[in-house]
Amino acid sequence: MKKMIDIDFGSTRYDELVELRYKILLEPLGLKFLDAHRAKEMNYLHIGCIEALDDKLIGGLMLAPIDNETVRLMEVCVETKYQREGIGRAMVQYAEKCAKEVGYSKMVMHARLTAVHFYEKCGFHQEGDIFEEQGLTFARMIKDL
């Protein structure tokens, strides 16, 4: 059974989430996770998905406030062997619920082109032109909550 959890910044579980993000999102591209990133993440909401039977973190994401209405969905990742089981979608839905509960009405994100279809199935739509950031190509996506 899978369970969504809130993760406290600086906790052991947060460190596990950083490791998972690095393994799934950065390492395959030859990118590094910099300690400077941690300072920015202090005020973000960190969400994880655990395998309830063994308490193992198998997915996670972050929500970064942009303004009083808008939150940015960031670094959605799922452990490779659990991908294509609906965990990513469930985490995004949980993140939307959390964002709405604290008063956000809009969620934005930068999706890698390979993930655009996934986010469209989650109700996001593309806004603006495709762009590059840190050598990767992204689509800006948005969803009203």
Question: For each predicted feature, which ranges?
Answer:
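Conserved active-site tyrosine of GNAT-family acetyltransferases
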Residues: 21, 119, 124
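Active-site rim helix/loop that mediates acceptor-substrate recognition in acyltransferases
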Residues: 21-53
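Conserved beta-strand in the GNAT
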Residues: 48, 55-64, 70-77
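Conserved acetyl-CoA-binding loop-helix of GNAT-fold acetyltransferases
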Residues: 78, 84-97
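Conserved catalytic-core motifs of GNAT/GCN5-like acyltransferases
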Residues: 108-110, 125-140
